[in-house]
Regions:
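Signature aromatic-anchored transmembrane alpha helix within multi-pass, membrane-resident enzymes
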Residues: 245-252, 390-420
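Hydrophobic, aromatic-rich transmembrane alpha-helices
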Residues: 297-300, 310-337
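Extracytoplasmic
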Residues: 414-570
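Membrane-helix boundary/interfacial segments in multi-pass membrane proteins
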Residues: 23-29, 83, 135-151, 272-288, ...
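Active-site lumenal/periplasmic loops and adjacent helix-entry segments of GT-C-fold
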Residues: 10-154, 173-179, 429-438
Length: 570
């Protein structure tokens, strides 16, 4: 049964996200993916997969520039083992993370929260429901694209499960530890450090996300433990009061330290909070009430412009029933409800408010609603899957009815979110024959794939990264001068970006081109999202050099032209 449920969930997820993607080589044509693809190519070329150095790709003058490298390292390993293109490795890895980490992880967390007799029905339900919402995993494959965060969120259920084991070992009132794990301390000793290391390498902020999800659990468990001692051990009441006072004092000190850090780190004396977090990802896209409705109805933003999934009414109704029953009957899983309300509130603030308070509370996630909404299934799945067997306990076939209900809910949810998720993936991963708004189209991709025959090995390709030339490494095995759309570039890179139209008249241009190993330029009139981004202006001289015929055309594909620089030859 469990194998069948896992298989159904994996197949459903694969169909949801890839049924509208016409080829396994197609990739997300989004801003962030340029970095992710080229970072993986950099690892393959240099052998350096260190988190301490990965961002030197866009900050080449820095000795240390940290960026979580777990995703890129895994993708590079897949390429080395299979000899497949990086783009196929990314798509395969996305499916593997969902199948091997997220789905089993959230099912394991759910099983940890129920007694052994209910474990099969709970696990089966969680396996099915793991892919039944649009919040995660699908949305992070469309928005961004946020591959490191996608990997990091998949690890959070396992981290929360380890917290559950830890609390069971330190809180005797909870009990039932060894019937689910016969060696809990060994599990903590081995899996705990490995999880922290893995989460840090996947994305360090996932540690904060896991803490935010587990915070209500810690408070809930601590309160239950102190309340039990207060009732059963009157002689300890004075000590309990001191413990509570210490916790409150520690909270005040921690809050003060955080306020001081924010004030100093973000230079609030000269730049108010309102001037921070003003990028696209931080702008409110919903009203407060609209965002609340999304949390309640499980209507997820997909990541594609103006596209959300339809409300999951059956699952939303069952979720509300489960939450109400858990709170009214004071179940040990009540913390899941409070955690859902807590994370949901953060999402509402990120999606529906531009206030200073919203920025402070959600700044750890860049006020990005997608990073926060991805945490909701971590709580929805365990809450529903652990409560249904208890609600069905008095029926004739409690386990079968609970599992069957989960199956119906999962199937109806898959059918509901399929059109929106499919459309979002189609729009984001499409490779049109000719288009001026995507990063690369079919004509340019064809030219990029000819680069190995046209550009000698060891030569870099220069171009405006906003028009697809930044993908020369991924599609043409030739390193681009600009491996991302923006960065803290070297003086030579800035010279060729801003003064290429002075070829033949400014010796500094040829000197910079020589040091960068550049004699080939790829030009195209296209631009991601149709152009207009101020960051693209610094590359305008590259287009002017082509317009002024300062370079020799070598190969043309539609409006895309590969040029050779002859004016710098001695």
């Amino acid at each position: 049964l469990l194998t069948a449920c896992w298989s159904a969930s994996v197949i459903a997820f694969a169909l949801l996200v890839f049924s509208k993607v016409h080829s396994p080589e197609q990739f997300s044509q989004t801003y962030d993916n340029v970095f992710h693809l080229n970072a993986t190519e950099s690892i393959l070329a240099t052998g350096n997969a260190s988190t301490l150095h990965l961002r030197t790709l866009t900050e080449p003058m820095s000795q240390i520039a940290m960026y979580p490298a777990a995703w890129h390292t895994a993708a590079a390993s897949v390429v080395q083992i299979t000899h497949l293109p990086v783009t196929i490795a990314f798509n395969g890895l996305a499916l593997a993370v969902a199948a091997a980490i997220w789905i089993p992880g959230v099912a394991w967390l759910s099983a940890m929260l129920v007694p052994l007799p209910q474990r099969t029905a709970t696990t089966a339900g969680a396996l099915l429901l793991a892919t039944a919402t649009g919040f995660y995993p699908a949305s992070l494959l469309i928005w961004g694209v946020l591959y490191p965060m996608y990997l990091a969120v998949s690890l959070i259920p396992a981290g929360v499960g380890l917290v559950v084991i830890l609390l069971r070992e330190t809180t005797p009132r909870w009990g039932r530890s060894r019937e689910l794990d016969p060696h809990p301390r060994l599990t903590l000793a081995i899996a705990g450090p490995l999880w922290v290391l893995g989460a840090f390498c996947a994305h360090p902020r996932s540690l904060i996300s896991a803490l935010m999800v587990a915070l209500p659990l810690l408070i809930w468990t601590g309160w239950r433990a102190l309340r039990g001692l207060w009732r059963t051990r009157p002689e300890l009441r004075r000590r309990i009061l001191w413990i509570i006072a210490g916790i409150l004092a520690g909270g005040v000190v921690l809050a003060g330290a955080l306020v001081a850090f924010v004030y100093v780190h973000y230079d609030l004396a000269r730049r108010p909070i309102s001037d921070h977090l003003t990028g696209v990802q931080a702008r409110p896209t919903e009203t407060i009430w609209g965002a609340i409705l999304q949390v309640v109805s499980l209507s997820a933003p997909t990541g594609a412009p103006n596209l959300s999934t339809w409300p999951l009414l059956p699952l939303a109704v069952v979720l509300l029933i489960c939450a109400g029953w858990v709170l009214v009957t004071r179940q040990a899983t009540g913390w899941l409800v409070w955690a859902y309300l807590w994370v949901g509130t953060l999402y509402v603030l990120a999606a529906g408010s531009n206030s200073d308070a919203a920025k402070v509370l959600t700044g750890m996630w860049y006020k990005d609603r997608f990073r926060l909404s991805a945490l909701l299934p971590v709580l929805v799945v365990p809450l529903v899957s652990t409560t249904l067997p208890r609600l069905c306990a008095r029926t004739r076939w409690p386990q079968a009815i609970a599992w069957g209900t989960s199956a119906v809910l999962a199937f109806s949810s898959w059918m509901t979110i399929a059109p929106s998720i499919g459309q979002g993936m189609r729009v984001t991963y499409r490779l049109p024959a000719k288009d001026s708004t995507t990063l690369v189209d079919g004509q340019q991709a064809a030219l990029l794939r000819q680069l190995p025959a046209l550009v000698p090995r060891g030569q870099r390709v220069l171009g405006d990264p906003w028009n697809g030339s930044s993908l020369s490494w991924v599609l043409g095995d030739r390193e681009p001068v600009f491996p991302h759309l923006s960065g803290a570039w070297t003086p030579d890179q800035i010279t060729v970006a801003t003064r290429l139209d002075r070829l033949g008249t400014d010796p500094a241009v040829c000197a910079a081109l020589t040091r960068l190993h550049v004699r080939y330029v790829l030009d195209s009139p296209r631009s991601l999202n149709g152009g207009g981004d101020p960051a693209e202006a610094q590359y305008a001289s590259i287009h002017r050099a082509a317009e002024e015929h300062l370079m020799t055309p070598m190969r043309r594909s539609g409006s895309n032209v590969l040029y050779r620089i002859d004016r710098c030859r001695k």
